[in-house]
């Protein structure tokens, strides 16, 4: 991969990690409201904890370049669920565009990983590529 691509992917990785971390933190800080919202769209209350944990922990992992591809898949699945359950009723209203962009960045990270300034090579030294992110 060329350096420009890696720098661009690094920027996507870092901002995506921050966004998901903040959203997960917000869900945990207002868990009662999060559970109520999940119930209002027909999801069981435990899913509020699952989604909040994926966003919070996944955000930290992606920010530091740990398991970027795996977390990218989890983020993409979470966003697909959100788009189907909430956003499809008004596909270009209510900040749905933001979810579409996050879905695309998550898919990009799942497909390409992110090697530049990532911690994967140090944590997963025995892996084939030395990096589960790429």
From Swiss-Prot:
Record's GO cellular component terms: plasma membrane
Sorted UniProt keywords: Aromatic hydrocarbons catabolism, Cell membrane, Detoxification, Membrane, Oxidoreductase, Transmembrane, Transmembrane helix
Annotated compartments: Cell membrane
GO biological process: catabolic process; response to toxic substance
Sequence intervals crossing the membrane: 5-25, 46-66, 70-90, 91-111
Top-level EC class: oxidoreductase
Expression induction or repression: Strongly induced by catechol, less strongly by 2-methylhydroquinone (2-MHQ) but only weakly by chromanon (6-brom-2-vinyl-chroman-4-on).
InterPro entries named in the record: DoxX (IPR032808), DoxX-like_oxidoreductase (IPR051907)
Homology family: Belongs to the DoxX family.
PANTHER family: INNER MEMBRANE PROTEIN YPHA-RELATED (PTHR33452:SF1), OXIDOREDUCTASE CATD-RELATED (PTHR33452)
Name this protein carries in UniProt: Putative oxidoreductase CatD
Species of the source: Bacillus subtilis (strain 168)
Gene symbol of the encoding locus: catD
